[in-house]
Amino acid sequence: AYTYAILTIPSADRESVYYLYGGSAVNFSLPELFGGGALGLILGVLAALILAGCVAAVIAWLIGLPVLRLKSDYLAIATLGFAEIIRAIFQWDRLGPVTNGANALKSFPTFSSFNIENANGEVVLRLSTFVPFLLVAVCIGIMVLLINSTYGRAFKAIREDEVAAEAMGINLAKHKRMAFCISSFFAGVGGGLFAMFANQAQA
């Protein structure tokens, strides 16, 4: 959610959003970089959602190095612990010019930004209803393709029996880390979609 918001807040609104920190350290907006307008909005939002997923995947890879050595409840506890650490880091005042500290990030494109209005400002086509379903359908399609791939079959083998999967030559550590990163990627995209729904992002 933070990655999406930081990358899509319009340049003209950054000073008002980051007023406690004298402005934002990030002085660009992806929709503006893509030329603005309807096409710039679509491309900018898609790029921001993908980057949000990538940032989440990179963080998951770093966390997975020590955490994936654990199993069962200990893995869940360690993951929750790292989540709280990351939340505290995002609220750190030193990072305020980037994350806005403990304050909410606002003014970024939301689902209502995709509605088509006439000259009087009245909504003539409410695309905000269909955009989230379209994005979720794309994510589900990618997941289905992944599940039916070679990697997906390896994931299912590990789920059923780790010992048997390792005996078949499947690298458990590599595939567990990959599954952790892939799930975090979609969680990052989901965070961006939640920010668009909630109209703000706050740790």
Identify the role of each PLM range.
Residues 1-203:
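Transmembrane alpha-helices and adjacent helix-loop boundaries
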